[in-house]
Amino acid sequence: MLVETKAKVGVFAIALGAYLPQFPTLVPEFETQYDAFKKTIPDTVEMIDGGIVTTKELSMEAGDKFRAADEDLVILQLLTYATSYNMLPAVRDLNVPVVLVNVQKRKAPDYANTDTPKWLGELYACGAVGEMVADLERAGKRHAVITGVVEGGDAYVAKEIDEWCRAAQVRRRFRYTNIAQIGRPYPGMMDLYIDETNLYNRMGLYTKQFDWEKIWAIADPVTDEAAIRAKAEEILDTFDIEGGATVETVWDMAKYVVAFEEWVKKEDLGMVASHYDCLLYTSPSPRDRSVS
């Protein structure tokens, strides 16, 4: 079964600390923008708040918090120009994608009433994009840029953030999901074999191996006739069986399905793959067949 757990998404914003003593109005401006930005993160994920980073030290603190949270994704709001030291210490030790959100507050300047603080606080989110992308490239970090505007709303930005959070959710689920492989490929079918190491390293998926002898036997201890009957009725309601069928004719099948569903829960499986097994059985039951 797929694990219902929330992805952990690190969120922080960056701005050059040297601007703040020169233009004190930037502090409440950036705080307001960052608070509004955090509300765009869907509640389907758990947000790890790294705060507004204006120095290397604050960036290191954010990085410590992100590592401790074992997060799946980092989303970074660019408030204005910032240096590499505002970002890299926060993400250096993380092996997750970094999404730069280059979202400007205003669509266009009001030139007659725009001064330096207005420019830096409302119109210069793009100032650090090139530098941050270059840093992430050199550091070998996976990254993406979302560009848009706050004024008037921007459906594209909201959609992109939501899709990244959905991807993080998939990653988190995979990390706690097991795959079952039952049986073995027919000799010579080399394309069916998987690289378990690669699958685990890239997606966090752990593979459990089972043989068909064990799988057929899981139905042997099932004695709950009420559960079997309910499953048989479900089978009859779900499938159009040619020639007709009754609870009695699908009883063995229903018994096995009950056992199989319990086995999936017990082994904590999200996916099950099966293939050829050459074993033949002689007892008069669903085991009396080769499986492919």
Task: Tell where the protein language model's regions lie, with residue ranges.
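Metallocofactor- and cofactor-centric catalytic cores in central/energy metabolism, strongly enriched
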Residues: 2-130, 141, 147-163, 168, ...
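A structure-centric signal for secondary-structure junctions around beta-strands
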Residues: 6-8, 176, 286
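Active-site-proximal region of nucleotide-activated glycan assembly enzymes
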Residues: 133-138
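Conserved anion/nucleotide-ligand pocket segment
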Residues: 166-190
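Short, well-ordered beta-to-alpha junction loops that form the rim of enzyme active sites
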Residues: 184, 274-277
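C-terminal appended segment following the main domain
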Residues: 262, 276-279
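Conserved small/polar residues in nucleotide/adenosyl-binding loops
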Residues: 281-288
